[in-house]
A protein has these predicted regions:
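Short acidic low-complexity segments
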Residues: 35-44
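N-terminal, charge-rich interaction modules
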Residues: 1-28
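Class I S-adenosyl-L-methionine
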Residues: 102-125
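Mid-chain, well-packed structural core segment of small domains
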Residues: 58-92, 97
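Short, glycine-rich nucleotide/cofactor-binding loops
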Residues: 47-57
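Positions that flank functional sites
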Residues: 22, 83, 113
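Short, charged/polar "capping" segments at the starts of alpha-helices
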Residues: 25-30, 84-86
Length: 125
């Protein structure tokens, strides 16, 4: 059985543009993303943001939100509580922070042993 790639789990097949923020946090995942849809500015169909802690979440989130297309998906990759590196964020704290900023979690994936990804969309008003 073939293992799904991170790009497959993120449903990138229909995305026409993708922006990655703080990719140096996990270059292995960044290297798996489809190069043909990469962009360095928004609006983007998909924004993938890496946050190792609350400080990075608060720093990169406004940039990600600004770059996100109206119907786009924001993926926040974060360290699992069981990861070898300490973190002060988790799915619930990220979703709470995002909701305060008009975006809500809709799905989750496991990226690898140390990282998870939370998919978020703009809250419809």
């Amino acid at each position: 059985m073939n293992e799904k790639t991170v790009a497959d789990k993120m449903f990138l097949r229909t995305a026409k543009s993708m922006l990655i923020l703080n990719g140096e946090a996990h270059p292995g995942v960044v290297s798996q993303m489809p190069k043909e849809i990469m962009t360095d500015k928004g609006p983007a169909d998909v924004v993938l943001m890496f946050a190792r802690n609350r400080k990075e979440l608060e720093h990169f989130f406004p940039i990600a939100k600004e770059a996100l297309g109206d119907k786009g998906s924001l993926w926040i990759a974060y360290l699992k509580q069981t990861a070898s590196k300490a973190t002060d964020i988790n799915r619930d704290s990220i979703n709470e922070f995002a909701k305060e900023n008009g975006i809500t979690g809709v799905a989750m994936i496991s990226i690898d042993m140390d990282w998870s990804g939370l998919r978020l969309k703009r809250i419809e008003v």
